[in-house]
Amino acid sequence: MNNQLVPQNAAAAAAAAAAAAAAAAANSLKSRKPYTISKQRENWTDEEHQKFLEALTLFDRDWKKIESFVGSKTVIQIRSHAQKYFIKVQKNNTGERIPPPRPKRKSIQPYPQKQKHDGMGAFIPDSLSGNHFISSSSFATWMTYRGLMPNISESQINPSDLQKQLEQLQQAQQYIQQAVTTAQSSQRNGGLPPNPSSNNGGTTLTPNFPKIYAFLSNLFESNGTSFTEALSDLSMIDRETMQILMHNLAINLANQQYRDNHQTLSEQYRMKRDEDEDLNAIMISPRNSTGNINVSGDFYDNNSNNNNNNNNNNNNNNNNNNNNNNNNNNNNNNNNNNNNNNNNNNNNNNNNNNGGDFGDQNHSNMVNLGNYYNNHPNQNTINALYSLNQPSTLSNNPLNMVGNLNPQKQPPFNLNLNMQSGF
């Protein structure tokens, strides 16, 4: 009986000791500091997000480099934004590349480094060698991400083929570096770059730049046809120069400063184009030299037939009166007949002078309208309409739209009057 109680008491004592040790260990641990937001959250603009994506492709999870690349966000903000972006990509399964997480400090497996491209430094001209973005080892990865370089995995390349490609790449790098250096030195001296392959004869060949730029412009056209025939027509120096220009174009397109300048120039061009369109819209508007709207004389044209009929009636009446006067005055002296003829001629001349240069027939038509409707009930409207052709009343007329102008030189215009009965 006593032998059975001893193990039970020992087990209870051991359990009590373990509980006491756990309680002491819990009391010895420091309490975790609660999380507090020290800085207000700021929204990311589209430009900042695009910079973040490019930096993520270049530097993976190197937050310090990403911070210097973005420039407007801190490391804490970048890591928070990256965490939300990674969750969104995994949730939507959109296929964007997510860099692998960095290992712990005591991890056995090292962090996977990107494949270094040893030859990228030789492609860079001297003017861009100080740019950290272009001179970085991740430039080739960025070019591959943008589709400017083919993306080939290591499993698809044999070691022997890789060695040959590296040798060819080194030779190409050396050649291009010499060509770029020669072009820069000749540009500083004010000349054209010589042909590197023409060392035997001592003569220098200059590239045909108009032909090269014409080929490049056709190459970038959306509806361009095959360019193999045009490429075969180029000489060796033209092909080499075109390769250098295309490589410089790729470097410029990868430069952030170039993109910023391109965006600024595009905005300035759009503003200038809008200003020119507004100016053209003002100049095309139908206005005369005094700034008023110059419209055609539709009222005169619509009533021209009536005016001509009135003129014919008046002329017939005048002829009848002249005939009657001639019949009644047959017994008079020849001197009286001559005087009547002279008076008639003077009257005709006066009537012809009333027409002037004012729209040819329109002025005489308006005078006849004023005479014909002299006794019309709407006398004020007729007088105002008739006064447009009189120099003495032109400046005082309330319907005047063009100011003090010579009525004999003023073209007809439409008054758009609300004419009452009789018109």
Swiss-Prot record:
Domain of life where this protein originates: Eukaryota
GO biological process, alphabetically ordered: regulation of gene expression; regulation of macropinocytosis
CDD domains: SANT
CC terms in the record's Gene Ontology section: cytoplasm; nucleus
Molecular function GO terms recorded: DNA binding
Keyword Transcription in annotation: yes
Location of the DNA-binding region in this protein: 63-86
Chain intervals with Low complexity compositional bias: 177-202, 302-354
HTH myb-type domain span: 36-90
NCBIfam families membership: myb_SHAQKYF (TIGR01557)
Record protein name field: Myb-like protein G
The organism of origin for this protein: Dictyostelium discoideum
Gene name of this polypeptide: mybG
